[in-house]
A protein has these predicted regions:
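Conserved polymerase palm-domain catalytic core
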Residues: 1-70, 74-89, 99, 109, ...
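Right-hand nucleic-acid polymerase module
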Residues: 29-30, 81-88, 101-195
């Protein structure tokens, strides 16, 4: 996140010069680019800075639906050409805001082909039901993590209960998705590793 863009946002929102200086110091406290994680003011700035993009999408008639979670965004429209125009508008707005778009993660796809958003794979079933599964890399990462946790337990650096708690957290999030078979396979791996 561009610090100058954040400071311009603060200038428009805060009138007290002492508070402005305090917020500026917080913005600059973690280098020249980006904001420190965990700080409430930094999280507010990170969410507020791209809000002009949200307003742009609300004013664009061809966009049927759009949404954003932190710095991830999606738009739904009927025509691919319209989406290319919207993407150009978003790029122009991002340039004004000092936001850099990751071209590797930016794409226009047919909804029927499916897409990955927030580490989840979205597809349509034959009946039109939206099927949400975990992306493959998340499952692979968890499998590796379980093996590392088993090594920690074996060396006595962690208890089995702590490993179970970590696994149950991941498992609970997977049960909200269409991932029953994945969860069963991971349960089998957990039983194999931890007995």
């Amino acid at each position: 996140i561009d610090h100058d863009a954040c400071k311009r946002l603060v200038d428009r929102s805060i009138t007290d010069d002492r508070i402005k200086e305090l917020v500026y110091a917080q913005i600059d406290s973690h280098g020249t680019r980006g904001l420190g994680l965990g700080s409430e003011p930094n999280q507010i700035l990170a969410v507020a800075l791209p809000s002009p993009i949200d307003h742009l999408l609300l004013r664009t008639p061809c966009v049927l639906h759009s949404g954003r979670y932190m710095d991830d965004l999606y738009c739904i429209a009927l025509d691919k050409a319209d989406l290319h125009g919207v993407l150009s508008d978003i790029r122009a707005e991002c340039e004004k805001l000092g936001i850099v778009i990751n071209d590797k993660k930016t794409r226009i796809v047919k909804l029927s082909r499916g897409f990955t958003y927030l580490k989840k794979r979205f597809n349509y079933g034959e009946t039109g039901k939206v099927i949400v599964r975990p992306c493959r890399s998340a499952v692979t990462r968890q499998r590796r993590k379980l093996k590392k946790l088993a090594a920690f337990v074996e060396r006595g650096e962690m208890t089995r209960e702590q490993a179970l708690q970590s696994y149950q957290s991941w498992r609970g999030s997977m049960l909200k998705l269409d991932a029953r078979r994945t969860v069963r396979a991971m349960d089998a791996l957990f039983s194999q590793l931890f007995g």
